[in-house]
Amino acid sequence: MKVVILMENSTCRDTVACAHGLSMYIETDKHKILFDMGPDAQFIDNAKALGVDLTQVDIAFLSHAHNDHCGGLEAFLKLNDRAKVYMQKAVWGQYYVVTPSKCAYIGMDAVLKNYEDRFVLCDGVQKLDEELTVFSAVPGRELWSGANDTLREKIGEDYPRDAFRHEQDLLVTENGKTALFAGCAHCGIVNILKSAEDVLGRAPDAVFAGFHLYNPSLGKSEPDELVDAVGEKLRGDKVAHYFTGHCTGKEAYARLKAKLGERLGEMPAGSDFTV
């Protein structure tokens, strides 16, 4: 399978824009897949610059309902009139970032309600065909990131911590190889990997995901102890290659790289991979 990074916080090409967000294009023998749509429509311009025709996408997935992943969704729906977008049932929750200095809505734009006929609402594990499986409701809180603490769901007048019921992950299998795609891994990359292995019966061959080890609202990386513990878990897993970026953060990436070596790589906008 081919993977092209359409949007990420950094870029490796002068002709490709970057922004805080994530969007990936995945191509297999049977499917042309869009996974997340970045913070705005810039990922569409990037796709054109990279030779990716988004009008040919036949299926799309939204990893979760934060606007750095769904901000460009309406633009995609206007460009592509056929692809269904798979997302969790809880995407219409009221999701906020809450810090001592701000309380800001970061969820789905209400205008997207006009496109509900294009959406497929998912729950649990759903095998769509021999190539695609989406799963959610990841159990466990091992090595849970403190960067999640500022992410909240408004329920009535309260703002409890987000339980990430709106998060889902994707397994793509082709020619005996499987890649795991996660947006921010808010449920914890270690926990998500365990769920992926339970679904697959083995470890995926590659992982493309943000690891959420940096809090952009506070400008803080997770403590070294937590990052190192995540690195040890990933090193002990049988995944051949991890590709990360977006919400992982530069400090955490450097510490993980020291543990994982050539098994870990970055995935800036404009980069492409073959699994």
Name each model-derived stretch.
Residues 1-14, 149-161, 212-223:
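Glycine-rich phosphate-binding "P-loop"
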Residues 1-50, 163, 167-182:
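Conserved beta-strand hairpin/beta-sheet module of binuclear metal-dependent hydrolase folds
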Residues 10-13, 42, 140-144, 187-188, ...:
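Short, acidic Gly/Pro/Ser/Thr-rich loop/turn segments
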Residues 26, 36, 47, 64, ...:
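Divalent metal-coordination and catalytic microenvironments
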Residues 42-93, 194, 198-207:
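Active-site metal-binding motif and surrounding structural segment of the metallo-beta-lactamase
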Residues 50, 81, 115, 238, ...:
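Short, structured coil segments at secondary-structure junctions
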Residues 67-69, 163-169, 173-269:
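Cap/insert and terminal regions of metallo-dependent hydrolase folds
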Residues 91-168, 235, 265-275:
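Metallo-beta-lactamase
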